[in-house]
């Protein structure tokens, strides 16, 4: 039995439980936390790899993704090229996008991804960086020599230099692993909205009083150019495309400024201020850019002449 001398001196009662001199009272062991699957290629158990350019079978039950509310897809049945070497992640992404109405072509390596991109026109490419053989960055460079299809990179390499390397080689977005399904959907929908906007002919963008000139990246009101910058033009075109709808700052940063939103970044607010001023100079009074507290901005069309 272990007895503390100070306890005896103070007359404290002594416990009678005998313990080995080498151990103290045993603390109850906490129950182990259940392991959670994350959308990262390194933690998925590998299955047999699919054949080249063959669609992986869609699992009967999606074990990774849960049901979420999706935003509206701006392009009917968009065509998606998915290049991912992890069979488990590839299958689940394939199943998820097919349920959303996408037409998906899946590839397990860069060489077959490049071959598929040369055979068919896609609305969006979802591309892993760490691929066997031809890696994702090399594939991206090859795609950019031939086409301007939006490309979103996926990678566990989330360092700043890795992201910069992806953007400088032509990526439109960069999604670090692990990622949430909600963020994946938000980013893909934002890219598809840009695709739809870019494909609209000039005639469909005409306002009875305001004309959008895609080539000059400017608007004209009563024959007078507003003198917009490319970012201001994209901002006004995006707001006009979603007139009456409050667009969040994260969405506008991705769609217009092509970067992620941070709370201390006031770049979008500056562009909105300049855009309001330039529209006022050319007497555009029927369009108002309103701030929505806690959300972002929306464009309101009034009956003002």
UniProtKB/Swiss-Prot annotation:
Q: Which gene encodes it?
A: pfeR
Where in the cell is the protein located?
A: Cytoplasm
Q: Which residues carry this modification: 4-aspartylphosphate?
A: 128
**Post-translational modification note:** Phosphorylated by PfeS.
Gene Ontology MF terms: phosphorelay response regulator activity; transcription cis-regulatory region binding
Q: Which GO terms describe its cellular component?
A: cytosol; protein-DNA complex
**DNA binding happens at which residues?**
200-301
Coarse class of the primary localization is: cytoplasm
Keyword vocabulary terms for this entry: Cytoplasm, DNA-binding, Phosphoprotein, Transcription, Transcription regulation, Two-component regulatory system
In Swiss-Prot or TrEMBL terms, this protein is called Transcriptional activator protein PfeR
Gene Ontology biological-process entries: phosphorelay signal transduction system; regulation of DNA-templated transcription
> What is this protein for, i.e. what is its function?
Member of the two-component regulatory system PfeR/PfeS. Activates expression of the ferric enterobactin receptor.
Which positions fall inside the Response regulatory domain? Answer: 79-192
Any Pfam family from its record, for instance, is: Response_reg
SUPFAM superfamilies associated with the record? C-terminal effector domain of the bipartite response regulators, CheY-like
- Organism of this sequence: Pseudomonas aeruginosa (strain ATCC 15692 / DSM 22644 / CIP 104116 / JCM 14847 / LMG 12228 / 1C / PRS 101 / PAO1)
């Amino acid at each position: 039995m272990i007895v503390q001398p100070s306890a005896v001196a103070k007359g404290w009662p002594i416990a009678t439980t005998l313990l080995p001199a080498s151990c103290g009272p045993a603390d109850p062991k906490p129950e182990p936390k259940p392991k959670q699957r994350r959308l990262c290629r390194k933690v998925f158990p590998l299955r047999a790899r699919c054949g080249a350019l063959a669609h992986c079978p869609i699992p009967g039950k999606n074990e990774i993704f849960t049901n979420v509310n999706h935003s509206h897809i701006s392009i009917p049945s968009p065509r998606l090229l998915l290049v991912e070497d992890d069979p488990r992640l590839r299958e689940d992404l394939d199943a998820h996008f097919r349920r959303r109405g996408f037409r998906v072509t899946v590839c397990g390596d860069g060489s077959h991804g490049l071959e598929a991109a040369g055979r068919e026109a896609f609305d969006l490419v979802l591309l892993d960086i760490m691929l066997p053989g031809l890696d994702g960055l090399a594939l991206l460079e090859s795609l950019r020599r031939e086409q301007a299809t939006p490309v979103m990179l996926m990678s566990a390499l989330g360092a700043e230099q890795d992201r910069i390397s992806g953007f400088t080689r032509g990526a439109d977005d960069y999604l670090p692993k692990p990622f949430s399904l909600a963020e994946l959907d938000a980013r893909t929908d934002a890219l598809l909205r840009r695709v739809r906007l870019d494909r609209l002919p000039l005639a469909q963008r005409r306002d009875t009083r305001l004309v959008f000139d895609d080539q000059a990246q400017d608007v004209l009101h009563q024959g007078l150019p507003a003198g917009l910058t490319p970012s201001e033009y994209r901002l006004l075109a995006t707001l006009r495309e979603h007139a009456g709808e409050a667009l969040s700052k994260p969405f506008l940063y991705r769609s217009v400024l092509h970067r992620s939103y941070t709370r201390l970044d006031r770049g979008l607010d500056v562009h909105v201020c300049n855009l309001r001023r330039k529209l006022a100079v050319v007497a555009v009074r029927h369009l108002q850019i309103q701030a929505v507290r806690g959300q972002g901005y929306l464009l309101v069309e009034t009956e003002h002449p």
